[in-house]
Amino acid sequence: MHMEQTPQEIAVDYAARWERAWNSHGALATAQLYAPDSVLVGAAIAAGRREIERALAFIFSQGWQRISIKVVNARAVGGLVLVVSEFSATGSGPTAGKILHGKSTHALARVDDTWLSAMHTAINGAPTPLAT
């Protein structure tokens, strides 16, 4: 696979675009960062941009309107960049004063000249140490 950027650079750039879209515009702008046939796996499974936009709009409507994303790991596998991230969302409205922590994975695929998420999983919850 030919990449002008390293997997880490691609992942950090994607996370920054996701943060900007979510923090500025919410669900519609964020859904555009997914491939047309992408799948989002969270509390429910959403397939395609329209369903993903609806799922994200529900989260946004609950007050989780600001997010910060930290890329933990990124690697190229085949034509994809696999990304592991941690996120913190801050609430407003019904969730004012609360912070939601979680982890997510993205399988990023190059669509035309843009890296988009082909599959995204998100798990809410505080960090859990690994058993030794």
Where are these regions (language model features)?
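A solvent-exposed, acidic/Ser-Thr-rich amphipathic alpha-helical stretch
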Residues: P7-Q8, V12-Y14, R20, A27-V77
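Residue-level signal for tight coil/turn positions that link beta-strands
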Residues: G78-L80, D112
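Basic/polar N-terminal segments that are highly enriched at the extreme N-terminus
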Residues: M1-E9, T132
